[in-house]
Amino acid sequence: MPFWWPLIVLAFAYAICKFLLMLIPPNVPSIDVDASDVLAHGKDTEENSFIYIPPRGRSQQSDKKVQCYEPATMKYLGYFPALSPTEVEERVTLSRKAQKTWAQSSFKLRRQFLRILLKYIIEHQELICEVSSRDTGKTMVDASLGEIMTTCEKITWLLSEGERWLKPESRSSGRAMLHKVSRVEFHPLGVIGAIVPWNYPFHNIFNPMLAAVFSGNGIVIKVSEHASWSGCFYFRIIQAALAAVGAPENLVDVITGFAETGEALVSSVDKMIFVGSTAVGKMIMRNAAETLTPVTLELGGKDAFIICEDADVSHVAQVAVRGTLQSSGQNCAGAERFYVHKDIYTAFIGQVTKIVKSVSAGPPLTGRYDMGAICLQEHSEHLQSLVNDALDKGAEIAVRGSFGHLGEDAVDQYFPPTVLINVNHNMKIMKEEAFGPIMPIMQFSTDEEVIKLANDSRYALGCAVFSGSKHRAKQIASQIQCGVAAINDFASNYMCQSLPFGGVKDSGFGRFAGIEGLRACCLVKSVVEDRFWPLIKTKIPKPIQYPVAENAFEFQEALVETLYGLNIWDRLRSLIDVLKFLTDQSSNVSRTRKSH
């Protein structure tokens, strides 16, 4: 006992010191970011008065300018240049030059960059959310959940664990190489390209940027033409934080444009990250194949939401509605297929109907609305076509939410929260990605049936399984083909930033987030060196030195069994043979050569 007391005292003292150090706030400088232009309500300035503004929608875009509007009100926000391929290549070249300097930076400096960003985000949550709301139509609460919390979680994870997972990692050397030390090193790739969507403009920029910059890379991000206004403001935050730590200019860049701009980016960088539709993802792959550029594709989703009869119906109903209506249903990992056990089917529909009836949609910054606008005007027509197809094939509308006061020019930007019942897999709503506030509910009888239904999709991003038995929920989830699974919850995986995120099938491949996503930004290099240099070096055994001996293959046979044989006695017997070969070889070689 006396032997352990000093160790216990030291451990206790260490814990106390660590706790006291936590009470000392880190020295993190503040940054100033000009937000005067994004706080104005709409742009009716003389500068932009000559531009034709279509009465509705964003489909009429100039080839040379990216025109920006508020989806919720259709107020004009301004325009940004659509970069040419030559301009894109110039931006990548500048980032590549800056990256060579940044690759030598310390993790201490990189962590300070993250802390500066985190401090600014926490202190300017309302500004960041309002900008996102204006550019995408989502509510402030939806922006806080999807933009602020997810980004802060990623920064916090990188601060606490990022360096650990980028340091050289020791690996076992195996039986044949016991005299060697093996490790894996993680080096920056160079310049990473990212093409990101409009649904969460703040997080979609910060997510790849944080991983790329922390791992020593430069990054050029093409923002969506439907969220360029917010993307260019968020870029100012990154620029200010980089300048505060003395990072080289142009390390990070945000570019605007259309397909031509994105294609040029794919052919210019060392790795591509694409988040978007399956159709565009296939185009990215084809273009990347020309230069053998590695790609990570996070594409569409049609997540299954499974509710067993032993689940808490009232609790699950709240989660289900949030999973459907968050950001007006415009989520990559969105709940799009609901499978409810027949014994609780009616009860679940009743609970969901009650909640959805209380939901109102409207311009998020003009009143207290639960749900905002649809970002793309033409998408409302697509959503209605999915509903009509289901109704034509026997489905029914259980309930639809209500609208607040909508401006005439923005009426097509909204779609009511809709619950469909009596649906089946013959309907498009259960097969095509909706990306909207529609909840189609289908009943099932057995676990085997619901697993088959959940896997009957070309998409395979995520799933959620609810059951009073955790074991049962885990058993069901383990048999569903997808990259992300939540037990008795929905989409909680994304708030666990140590976890990789991505899917299979038409939902893409590769992973971002977590250890796997961080290391995906790296050149993964295997390194082997002598363990006892210079005392023990690798030496070619005499039997297989050139010119090889007559019994070289017999030597190899004995060596293989010595190293890998399953029976210890056979291995020892073979070891004796190996030693004989090594000691007798010189005379054997001599006799062999003389005979010729």
From Swiss-Prot:
Enzyme Commission (EC) number: 1.2.1.3
Site (Transition state stabilizer): residue numbering on this chain: 199
Keyword S-adenosyl-L-methionine applies: no
Tissue specificity as recorded in UniProt: Constituively expressed at low levels.
Residues holding NAD(+): 276-281
Keyword match NAD: yes
SUPFAM superfamilies: ALDH-like
Pfam family, one: Aldedh
A Gene Ontology molecular function term of the record: aldehyde dehydrogenase (NAD+) activity
Keywords, ordered alphabetically: NAD, Oxidoreductase, Secreted, Signal
Induction: Not induced by abscisic acid (ABA), dehydration and salt stress.
Catalytic residues in the record: 298, 332
Main location: secreted
Catalytic activities: an aldehyde + NAD(+) + H2O = a carboxylate + NADH + 2 H(+)
GO cellular component: endoplasmic reticulum; extracellular region
Location(s), subcellular: Secreted
InterPro entries according to UniProt: Ald_DH/histidinol_DH, Ald_DH_C, Ald_DH_CS_CYS, Ald_DH_CS_GLU, Ald_DH_N, Aldehyde_DH_dom
Range of residues in the leader sequence: 1-30
Family: Belongs to the aldehyde dehydrogenase family.
Protein name: Aldehyde dehydrogenase 22A1
Taxon lineage: Eukaryota, Viridiplantae, Streptophyta, Embryophyta, Tracheophyta
